[in-house]
Structures are given as C-alpha cells and as structure tokens.
C-alpha cells in the first residue's frame, strides 16, 4: 500500500472517530434516517413484547457498541457477484446503524483462510463453496466501503490458530491450506485441526497475516476471539516443551500465547498506531488461564511499550442469577461482570463485555428458575446495557448479528432491537 493511500485512510479514520463520538450525545441525521426504515423481523408472526427500557438521555462518551458478524452470517450472504454481496453488506450495515452500534467485528479469517485477497491464506470456502477459489471480487473491501460510508468502524476478526473445526468445516481444504503446506505446524484435536501454539514459525505466520491485513486494508482494528490452545492434552506440544527446558507446562503455554498476542499487537501498531487490537476471551477467567492459557493479569496490566492488547472483551453469555448445578452463582451476569471489573487493569486497557444475543427466547441453561424466562422479556439485552453503563464498563458487543436480525425468535428479536435502539438513541 502506498503512503498516499495510507494517509487517506488515516484521515478517514479520524472522520469516523468524530462521527462516532457525535453519536454519544445525539442522534445523527443518518441514524434518524435509518431508524425510520422498516427492519424485517422474519417470517414468524407472534406479537413482540413491549420493551420496558426508557430512552437513555445521554450515551456514555466513547462507548464501544459492537456486533460480531461471524462465518455463520457470511454463509447466508450472496457471493454470486460483487453487486449481490454489496446489497447484502449494505443491508447488514444499515441494520447495525439502526441499533445505534458503532463497530462491526467481521470474521474474515475463520479457518486459516480469507474473505479478502491474501498472499498467505487461501480464499475462504464461504465465498464460492470451494476453499481457494477466487470469487472475482474482494468481500472485505466491500464490507469496509459499506461500513465506512455509514460512519461505522470495522474490525477484522481473525481466528489465529484454527484451520478446521471438524471433518466437514471446511468441507475440503485448499492445496495451500497450512494443513497441507506445513503439516508439521499442525495439531489435531478430535476432528479439528489447529496451528500448534508451541511452534514459533506457526505463530510468526499468524502475525504476518495480521500485518498483511492492516497494511493492505483500511480496517479500524484487529480482533482475536477465544480460540487459543485447543486442548489441555500435554501430548500436543510435548516435544517442544521438553526442548524448552521449562518446568511448568501451564506457565510455558501462557508464554507461548502471550508471545503471539503481543507480536500481533505490535504488528498492528507498526502499521498505524491509531488502529486497535483486542481479544475476546472466554467469560470464565479460570478457563482462560488454565485451559486457553491466556495470561489475563499481564494482558490487562501491561502498558506503553509492553502493552499486549488495547482491550479485552470477555464473553459474558450468562443471565442474571445464573446458577450452576452446584448452587454457585459466580457466573451470574451481575457477579462475573463485577469480578472482571475488579481485576487490576492499566488505564490504557479498555474492558468491554460480550453478550449473548443468541440466548434470546432460549435461555442460558442455568439451574435458576428464570434461566429461560428472563430471556423472553424483549428487553434482556437492554437491561444488561443499562447495568454495564452504571458499572462503568467501556462498551459491549453482541454475539451475534443473526440472532437479532435472522432469528427464529423473530418477535422477541424485534422487541430486543427496539429496546436497544431506545437505549442507544
């Protein structure tokens, strides 16, 4: 990318930031326009509950309001031509804007492949049905154009290690999939295939992929999800651990993951210091530390030249009063968010919260009596937003787009959208 093009993107990012800050105090003309547009609620005709949340008089300044757009959403989009994909992308961005969101997190590397032109990874099978096949246009470029035209930021969501989640996803791997070109970098877990976090060359390749994205596209940031070590099985990296001379497997694995995340962060900042790099870990801090091997204390507290992330967005997909079969309420929404907020954190590191829109009408599986009913009010997500704002959280993200706009629970989803729109207006 030329310096001239980089400068143009930098100026455009400043413009978007000013636009988004403006959303914090009042509804822009563009947002008003989109709110007046009808949003299809799906084919089900059940009446929607009336949202109980009153409009918020003033949005928190700088609040991050995001939605995850996963490979599941892309699987339902029309890639038959650039025009068809652009129409779907435009509708998606319109819907995001109508909710008062300001950030779209688009999963552009779900299986060691790419929804963009890459010299490192094959085209995603989501584009044509065949991994490695060029769709004839650049989906990420289209997404960026449509997002930025509406003042929305777009962060490129990268799954760093996963190449395959099962024998059929993706159905057939391209010849230049890393599973084929570098099988020595890969570990298999059940039917899945993952880059081995203990192999430095594999981590370096992931970082090169991050650099390629931020150098070639006007993304507003890079976003990693919670897929780090795929298993606690000591056999997957036994040879590397033995060669390391270290005594503590858990600590060594945390170092491996942190080395990758730190390098990805630094690659983003080297391309443009104004870009953001964030990670969405599991909501259970114990699982993060001891199963995913994420060193939360380091990630949250490191700053300056030692910074590892710009933000963390733990996935808090439990409702109020969520109760385990043991009787523990540690993971109840009100308790686990307070636990995260109490963790030591550098002033420069933001803390956001991922929330489970997919729980709407279904529930969270808790042992508490209202584990389903509280997700059937039409204002479950808005209630959480209100409480997060009161607690001082910096923002939130919704998993996932389809749960609000393509849900089988169309009546409830419509009510949840209305409640969120009222809060974000």
Question: What residue ranges belong to the model's regions?
Answer:
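Catalytic domains of carbohydrate-active enzymes, especially glycoside hydrolases
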Residues: 88-113
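Active-site-adjacent "subsite" loops/lids of carbohydrate-active enzymes
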Residues: 62-64, 68-70, 74-79, 161-212
